[in-house]
Amino acid sequence: MSVLSVRDLCKKYDQFELNKVSFELEPGTITGFIGRNGAGKTTTLKSLLNLVHPNSGEIVFFGKSYKENEFEIKQKIGFVAGGIDYYPKKKIKTITSTTRPFYKNWDEKAYKHYMDLFDLDENKTPDELSAGMKVKYSLVLALSHNAELLILDEPTSGLDPVSRDDLLDIFMGLSDEGITILFSTHITSDLDKCADNIIYIKNGKILASTDLTSFLAQYKVLELTDEELTDELKTKLIGCKKSKHGFSALIRATDSEKLDLAMSGADLESIVVRLEKE
């Protein structure tokens, strides 16, 4: 059974439309949710949290309709975002005491375990925490009510490379424990390291929803000289641009099979940047 199933989700605004968004999340997987600003990521996440009311479509968590089981479902969901500002002068233990009553499955033993694991001092205030430690505290709150699904909205934004890598290790460890993660981010290199699956949204439409390996295998990066960039080849290229030694472009793997040219595998950033300019 899927942890989350979204079917034909639509939301209309004056200048933007979320258009029949559909995808599924399988248990214990990390799914990267990518797309440029304004593509529909935030609207989708807010719809999942019932902060935005879609015009049509269906959202099913753990095999149950969201509309009819919202309270029960939210007991199993944790939301973590980068840049969350808690009461800056309140001690962490006070914030925890305020949060605890909202969850019927609050597990004090788990709370203490993750506070120790993440080396957090509950006598400190958010003002005394780094950005990375604030994200870890958000994770503690989510995991202390035994969340089975974590929805992450730019959790590594603004963090230094070491802190980001530390969090990615944590996410992968949680996935190994069976927790499902939906990871919305602009930092595609993070997803290269940890994602099992990718959802790519552009202009309110899902253009890809597949496993990461299959998504990357669909494209190659070509490095071309002026002489190699023929008019016929140009028709097959995606996001061709001038490079240090000639031209660089993306090409679909199916179009590259008979080409005797220098090419390499593509990472997420190479693919998304060029697809956005297509």
What are the roles of these predicted feature ranges?
Residues 237-278:
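C-terminal coupling/interaction segments
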Residues 25, 57-68, 72-73:
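Conserved ABC transporter NBD signature motif
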Residues 75, 79-137:
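ABC-family P-loop ATPase nucleotide-binding domains
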Residues 150-154, 159:
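Catalytic Walker B motif of ABC-type/P-loop ATPase nucleotide-binding domains
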Residues 49:
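Helix-to-loop junction immediately C-terminal to a conserved catalytic motif
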Residues 167-251:
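ABC transporter nucleotide-binding domain
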Residues 6-9, 16-26, 33, 57:
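Conserved beta-strand
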